[in-house]
Each structure stands twice: as C-alpha cells, then as structure tokens.
C-alpha cells in the first residue's frame, strides 16, 4: 500500500505547481507554491495482505455545514465503526462538505478514528464556486485529497475513482455558473488508457458522485466498460438508496445490464427532522430509509452490499407500516407496507400473520413511503408552533424499495405480522410488527 497521512488519507500522488493554484480571490485556498521540480519523486510502497475476500465501507454525502454537523457524523455513524469494522478501507462518495470547505479537515480527523485508509470522491458541494473553469474548481479539494480522478487495486478488484462534476457557465446572459454531470474527454481518455492495462476477467468498480444515469457523457463511459463481463458503478448525491440496472433503454450495449448503486447518505436528508435524545436529527431520507452507510464485500469477481443504519442495530433492515388499530371490517382492505432499505427489483419480499399462515408474496410498488409522509406532516405542524427548532424534512420521493400487501380478514385481538426478504445477493432478513384489531 501507499503511505497514509495522519488522517489515514492515501498519499499516492505528488502535486507540482511551482506558482501554486490559480486561486486569486478564492474564498477557500488551493495548493501553495511547490517551487521547482525536485530531483526525484519517490513513492514508497508497504507490503500488506490483500486476500481474494475483503470489505470496504461506503459513505455517501456526509455533507456537514459546520462543526456541529461534523459532530453529528461522529456520534451517529463513526463511533459505531471505531474498533468494530473489518473493512480494509473506506470511500466517501462525494459531498464531503456542504459548500463550507473548512469542514474537510475536521471531518477527516473524525473519520480517521475508524483506523483504515480512506479514499475520497469529489462532489458538487466540494468545489470552489469562485472558479471560472473546471480545472480550477477542484483546487481546495486537490490540496487536501489529491487528484479528483485516479485508480487503485485492492486484492483482485480494480477501483476507478471518477470526477463527474462539470463546473460550467450555465447562463451566459446572467453570468451564472453551475454544475452538471460530466466526465469530459480528458478523463474518458484516462479511463480508456487505465482499463487497457486491466485484464478482461478482473472486476472493475467505478466510484463517482453524481449517479451514472444522470451524467451527460455517460455513453462514452459505457463504450469503455460494456464489453467487460465484470463491472459495477457506485454513486451517491440523490440522498436515497437505489439499485439501477442499466440496459439498452439508456444506450447500454453490453450483453448484461450494468449494475449501478446509489448509496445511502451519512447525512440522510441533510440533517433534517426532529432531533432524537442525543440531539441528532433523525435525517430520514425522502424514500423513507434512514441515514447511514454501506459495507460492500468482495470475493474475486463477486460482491454483495449491506446497509448499515445510523445509530441502530445493524440487523434493522426494514420498516413495516400500518395503523396501530383496525376494526374487523377494515382489515381486509388495509395494506401493510414494507420499506426494505437495501431492496431492489431482484429482492423477494413475503408476509405472514401470527406465525401460522402461509408466506405470501408482497407487491413491489413505486409509491412514496407512507411513514415518511406522516412524519413529515406531523413535524410540519410542530414547526408551525415552534419555528426553527429543526430543519424541515424534504418532500417525499418515490421509494424504489417499497412493497405492500393487504391484510387478510382478522378476528379481534392482537396479531403479529412478519415480513421476510432475500436480496439479490442471497442475504435474508426478517421484520416484525403487531396490529390491534377491535370489533366493529
């Protein structure tokens, strides 16, 4: 492996900018002048065991606005991993900060407590908004983390960290600058040259911030990876948890759909929602899933993903929702909803009642999460009484991992509901909920 900084950031690069960054007037500074090129640039490498099987932690959008939100991250996510994870390294999938680039370093110090090498991806909230071209927009990021795109191997897997933040003049009439998803020809050439050295039967994992399906020049990347039998891409950005399978409907020409994961975010819904007993907002995402991170496991060319909810038992993998009390005449008309956080179209989800009935398949639906809607409405009423007590939750979004099934007709009494699920990786989980039925 390469050397690590005191914050466990891999030191695999040398920055040569004799006059420093072109960042005159930037709010956040870039690279200081490096002076003349040294006589040699040396990269020590240290031997380490890299077995066929290994794991990595994935953080989407920690996105702290200030030190208080860095503390939220520390208490809600980091502390549970310190001394307890068997991951070989971790990756933050962009939006390391929320425009305030002074939070980079305190967040680095927090994540460093996990005790493993930590790679970083550039996000749209990690750039210098003062820049007037893409090349200079990454100067502060580059000073702390190094290049915005690069590659590395761990064990049998090849990783490509990509920069898909295209900083551009959005409106020439007003002079307004903004971003869109884009790799650019220079980076696509780098990817082409990099992959030319990677055997066809090696798993390639591409990590970026904006989801691949939203990147303007994604078809150029498709052409570079679609003939490879083993590839995976991972992003964040949307503050949801999603699995996408890219096909010819989006211009993919490979023999099999390409799996793209949109990872859960550490900050959830930007630290919105009422605080818990620790003073930390619940931060439920707009798809009804909690904030948290993921653990990805590799075994040669195979991989699997595990959702790690923040501040909860790691075995909590779903929410089951229905009213607390129903009349007997209502039961057969009442749906049970199961929000399976890491679920996809390839998951099986089934339900049974009172541990004696048969398991019945639940229907995968594209709806908003009803518990998110109720929570949002309730909190909005409280905020009307006490404005500014916490940040208002976002609008609900369509959940891609929601299932439902109506209850059968039930007699009065307390009834136990079980939901079981098996995901595309063969991982099984069980959820429980009870309902009280009263006579009409």
Protein language model features and the residues they cover:
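Short beta-strand elements
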Residues: 10-20, 24-25, 424-440
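Extended active-site neighborhood of metal-dependent phosphoesterases/phosphodiesterases
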Residues: 12-33, 101-200, 218-234, 238-299, ...
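N-terminal active-site segment of His-dependent metallophosphoesterases
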Residues: 19-104, 193, 439
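Surface-exposed, short loops/turns at beta-strand junctions within beta-sandwich domains
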Residues: 35, 407-413
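Active-site glycine-centered loops adjacent to acidic/histidine catalytic or metal-binding residues
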Residues: 61, 94-95, 123-124, 209, ...
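Aromatic sugar-binding surface patches on proteins
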Residues: 116, 368-406
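Short acidic, glycine-rich surface-loop motifs adjacent to enzyme active sites
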Residues: 194-214
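Binuclear metal-dependent phosphoesterase catalytic core
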Residues: 254-343, 347-350, 402, 406-407, ...
């Amino acid at each position: 492996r390469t050397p690590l900084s005191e914050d466990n950031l891999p030191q695999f690069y040398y920055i040569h900018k004799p006059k420093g960054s072109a960042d005159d007037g930037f709010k956040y500074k870039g690279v200081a002048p490096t002076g003349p090129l040294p006589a040699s640039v040396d990269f020590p490498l240290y031997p380490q065991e890299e077995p066929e099987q290994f794991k990595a932690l994935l953080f989407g959008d920690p996105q702290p606005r200030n030190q208080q939100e860095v503390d939220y991250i520390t208490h809600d996510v980091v502390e549970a991993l310190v001394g307890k994870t068997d991951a070989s390294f971790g990756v933050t999938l962009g939006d390391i900060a929320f425009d305030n680039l002074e939070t980079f370093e305190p967040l680095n110090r927090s994540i460093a407590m996990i005790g493993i090498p930590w790679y970083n991806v550039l996000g749209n909230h990690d750039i210098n908004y003062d820049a007037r071209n893409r090349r200079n927009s990454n100067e502060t990021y580059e000073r702390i983390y190094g290049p915005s795109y690069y590659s590395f191997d761990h064990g049998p897997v090849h990783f490509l960290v990509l920069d898909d933040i295209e900083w551009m003049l959005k409106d020439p009439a007003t002079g307004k600058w903004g971003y869109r998803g884009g790799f650019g020809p220079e980076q696509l050439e780098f990817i082409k040259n990099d992959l030319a050295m990677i055997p066809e039967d090696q798993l390639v994992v591409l990590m970026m911030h904006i989801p691949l399906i939203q990147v303007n020049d994604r078809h150029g990347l498709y052409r570079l990876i679609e003939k490879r039998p083993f590839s995976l891409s991972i992003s964040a950005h949307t503050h949801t948890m999603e699995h996408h399978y890219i096909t010819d409907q989006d211009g993919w020409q490979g023999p099999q759909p390409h799996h793209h994961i949109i990872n859960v975010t550490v900050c959830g819904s930007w630290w919105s929602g009422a605080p818990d007993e620790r003073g930390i907002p619940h931060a439920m995402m707009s798809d009804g899933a909690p904030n948290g991170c993921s653990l990805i496991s590799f075994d040669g060319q195979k991989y699997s993903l595990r959702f790690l909810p923040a501040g909860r038992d790691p075995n909590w993998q779903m929410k089951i929702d229905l009213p607390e009390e129903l009349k007997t005449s209502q039961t057969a008309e009442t749906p049970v909803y199961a929000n399976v956080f890491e679920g996809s179209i390839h998951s099986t989800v089934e339900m049974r009642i009172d541990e004696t009935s048969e398991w019945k398949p639940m229907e995968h639906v594209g709806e908003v999460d009803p518990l998110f809607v109720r929570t949002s409405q309730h909190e909005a009423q409280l905020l009307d009484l006490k404005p500014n007590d916490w940040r208002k939750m976002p609008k609900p979004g369509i959940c891609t991992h929601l299932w439902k099934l109506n209850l059968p007709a039930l007699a009065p009494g307390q009834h136990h509901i079980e939901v079981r699920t098996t995901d595309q990786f063969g991982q099984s989980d069980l959820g429980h909920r009870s309902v009280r039925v009263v006579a009409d």
